[in-house]
A protein has these predicted regions:
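A compositional/biophysical signature of low hydrophobicity enriched in polar/charged and small residues
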Residues: 1-201
């Protein structure tokens, strides 16, 4: 797995890749393993910070990064490099990242580091996305299972990450905290288990 510096986590141009399909005959798990491994997949256009299979409205997810402001490189990374690996996807550019409140304010964006069970919740809002993001974080008190959130430029306005030690720990709050937040008009959730899950061959 890629070793990512703390600086890379919150600098540069970030995007979230929602993998809808892979080339016929390929297995999504094999594709994800390949793009997540810097020894098997590297590009001068960008890098994969995290990738996993997912269960929900898409079959895989990747968090990718290009150099600051280099949209051309990001497009090459998605439409040439990832496409060549068989990745058919929807995507969103990451905007403002949620920042914790208080004296030691820190950025807290989705899919940086988290426990094994994860819910990635795409949120559409009819209000100010930054205000809705802050309200969702407030409902969790900046604590687990809330891991982070970002404004996104794509089909949804926000991406929120919940993570915990069980599936219930991340699925129940989608219904009780996120969907009930003022300004939320729809959510779209996929789940990721980042522990070992494949049957040994």
């Amino acid at each position: 797995m890629t070793t990512i510096s703390d600086e890379e986590l919150y600098t540069g141009l970030h995007a979230f890749v929602f993998i809808k399909e892979v080339d016929p005959g390929r297995n999504i798990a094999d594709v994800v393993d390949e793009i997540a491994d810097p020894e098997r997949f590297s590009s001068e256009n960008g890098q994969v910070l995290f990738a996993s299979v997912a269960v929900g409205s898409y079959i895989g997810f990747a968090h990718v990064r290009a150099e600051e402001g280099d949209l051309a490189a990001l497009q090459r990374f998605i439409y040439q490099d990832l496409w060549a690996k068989g990745v058919g996807c929807e995507h969103a550019v990451e905007g403002p990242v949620y920042t914790t409140m208080g004296a030691n304010a820190q950025p807290k964006g989705p899919k940086r580091k988290s426990p094994p069970f994860c819910a990635l919740v795409r949120v559409r809002t009819d209000d100010d996305p930054v205000a809705v993001m802050r309200e969702i974080a407030r409902r969790f008190g900046d604590t687990d299972p809330f891991q982070g959130a970002s404004v996104t430029f794509g089909r949804a306005d926000l991406l929120v990450e919940l993570a915990g030690d069980t599936l219930d720990a991340v699925s129940e709050p989608v219904l009780s905290a996120i969907r009930e937040a003022p300004g939320v008009i729809w959510t779209d959730t996929a789940f990721i288990y980042s522990g070992p899950w494949r049957t040994p061959s």
